[in-house]
Amino acid sequence: MSRVRLEVCCGSADDVIQAHRAGADRVELNSDLFHGGLTPTLGELIVAKRETGMPIMTMVRPREGGFCYTAAEFDTAVEDAKLLLRHGADGLVFGFLHPDGTIDLERTRVLADLAREAGKESVFHRAIDVVPDWRKALDGLIALGITRVLTSGQEPDVALGTGTVREMI
């Protein structure tokens, strides 16, 4: 049986360094974890990568408060994603929804394609936990080539959503 990889959610370069020292296999780098995680600064990514050399997935989320973004917010996310990939990100973590709660496949495709073209991973984050039909959503993400999904099984706590997570796998 293969060993489970340990990925740690980090809010700073210091967090990444500590996770690396503690044996994490990879990290997800964010800023503002208090608000669910936002796009980290390039400086945090550069320092974390330089100090650890470990795989770093980076959150691409322009603001707190849901997963429906204006055109300008989405354009900001795209530009951030390009810069993060150019400066060492090993993948992008993101989630885009329509106002009705369904996945915005067009916007999701844009970031998935950016990651794929750079030879990196794309992870759809916990926005999947608020979609009305996770099965349909998951099928759409698979069709787009999304590498992984970050979920708590449509519950606030993964311990409560374990059954759904098992179904998703």
Model-derived features: where do they sit?
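Glycine-rich phosphate-binding active-site loops on the catalytic face of alpha/beta enzymes
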Residues: 25-38, 83-99, 146-158
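Hydrophobic faces of well-ordered beta-strands that scaffold small-molecule active sites
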Residues: 4-10, 27-29, 48, 56-60, ...
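N-terminal pre-domain/capping segments
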Residues: 1-27, 32-39
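Active-site-adjacent beta->alpha loops and helix N-cap segments on the catalytic face
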Residues: 13-17, 33-57, 72-75, 96-116, ...
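Active-site mouth loops of central-metabolism enzymes
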Residues: 2-12, 60-78, 97, 122-134
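Conserved, mostly hydrophobic/aromatic
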Residues: 19, 84, 111, 125, ...
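Glycine-enriched alpha-helix->loop->beta-strand junction motifs that scaffold or abut catalytic
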Residues: 21-27, 51-55, 88-91, 116-119, ...
